[in-house]
Amino acid sequence: MHILKMKKHSIFGSALLSTALLLGACGDNEEVTATVDSSQVQNEFGFQAFELDIDTADQNDAIEASFDIDVSETEAEYVNKLESKDLTGNEAYTELEPIFKDLALTKDMSKEDVIEKVSKAFGAEDYTEFELEVEFSDGDNQEFSDTK
């Protein structure tokens, strides 16, 4: 009887721990809850997904920006250690939107042009490592990387 009680408590404890971990993970929400018109955004930005990672001599992962829009949701995250910014969701989107509009990236741009425009827009022209993955509005995926 004592073993059965312990087993019951062990299962209950595991379920409780699993629930706590699941709820804790939900707190790291990158979802943009503000209304975002996906077709308008794709026309303005020229892309539907953007994943950037820039290292500088002084700071690994100095800048990380991610944006993904689809029919059901939009996600955004922006970390800029050079400016002490760590934003997710609506705050990240508000910060990234004007940068993305100014970039005016197209899939026909050269690697050099893309890297120059993006590193300048994010204030990281002196990067040591640059990695960018973009999914353009037509679904074409391109990767741009450089090391200095």
Describe the function of each predicted region:
Residues 16-18:
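Hydrophobic helical h-region of N-terminal Sec-dependent signal peptides
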Residues 22-25:
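C-terminal motif of bacterial Sec signal peptides marking the signal peptidase cleavage site
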Residues 120-144:
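Short, exposed beta-strand-loop hairpins at the edges of beta-sheets
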Residues 47-49, 60-62, 127-129:
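Extracytoplasmic
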Residues 27-30:
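Bacterial signal peptide processing site
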Residues 61-125:
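Mature extracytoplasmic domains of secretory-pathway proteins
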Residues 35-56:
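Post-signal peptide N-terminal segment of mature Sec-exported envelope proteins
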Residues 3-13:
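Bacterial N-terminal signal peptides that target proteins for export
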